[in-house]
From Swiss-Prot:
UniProt xrefs under Pfam families: NicO
Induction behaviour: By nickel and cobalt. Transcriptionally repressed by RcnR. Probably also regulated by Fur. Cadmium, copper and zinc have no effect on the transcription.
Family assignment from sequence similarity: Belongs to the NiCoT transporter (TC 2.A.52) family. RcnA subfamily.
Name of the molecule in the record: Nickel/cobalt efflux system RcnA
Source species of the chain: Escherichia coli (strain K12)
Amino acid sequence: MTEFTTLLQQGNAWFFIPSAILLGALHGLEPGHSKTMMAAFIIAIKGTIKQAVMLGLAATISHTAVVWLIAFGGMVISKRFTAQSAEPWLQLISAVIIISTAFWMFWRTWRGERNWLENMHGHDYEHHHHDHEHHHDHGHHHHHEHGEYQDAHARAHANDIKRRFDGREVTNWQILLFGLTGGLIPCPAAITVLLICIQLKALTLGATLVVSFSIGLALTLVTVGVGAAISVQQVAKRWSGFNTLAKRAPYFSSLLIGLVGVYMGVHGFMGIMR
């Protein structure tokens, strides 16, 4: 059976490193806690670029620490399953978990957009029904429906942040603490990197994948924080595709995770059949 470690010894490790960076970057773009909370926090406190960088790095550090703790635990447990016959079954089980995670991410994003659009249509219908004299511009309505999308949970966090910090002076320690606590939220992409690390059974490469994921996450979070400090509105005006990219990021992320799961599942199945 061709194991992941054998593939890495053959010089194929380059595939996993950029994939981990891409997963981290896509996770940072997904609508949810990190991006929405950071942008809301920076805007509410009227933060500087330096504070935005601090916030992004703090969230990345805490996120990396959580992944490290889980990864070390997984690697310790995986040492009990060193038999050659157990390896393909572990790969197959991991593949099922990864593919299920990808499907859940895709379905959650699709359902969230559907519910959001249905609520918008319902609101417009009720408004039109109660006020026949008021007319909406169709072009503006279309743009509003397909504008920036946020799930209700993330928007609630953003509103709460605005109420708590609007107009207040905050210290660097408070900014770091906010970033550290925000980065503790687990994500499906980090779970995928964890499962890959367990299958590789290589501490050095596992650490590299975790660091690569963190680099991608840091690039996105710092960029979003700096963009919020400069002005998110200006960025959206200058680049019309920014909102579309942010809204579609979960689909790309789930597709990439699904491909990783299929790859692992095929190798696990081939190992079982031999």
